[in-house]
Amino acid sequence: MRRVKEIGGVAYKFVSPSNRGVADRLVVLPQGVVWFVEVKKEGGRLSTLQNIFAAEMVKLQQNISIVWSKEDVDDLIKEMTE
């Protein structure tokens, strides 16, 4: 996620072996802002566990986004910088 670096952040590939369904990327931005980002190809779908994880993060008031296309990435970067 080169675009994250351009806005001063770091994107980590996130793997949690004992917790299937977690987001693909953990994006850390300045001022303590953290995003969980699930990257899907167009036409892909979220698994049941990914949906559960996303709902859990929303319930915990965490930043989470699912990106399906370059346009989604552009929109997310814009949201991250607002």
What are these regions (language model features)?
Residues 1-82:
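Catalytic phosphate/metal-binding cores of nucleic-acid and nucleotide-processing enzymes, i.e., regions
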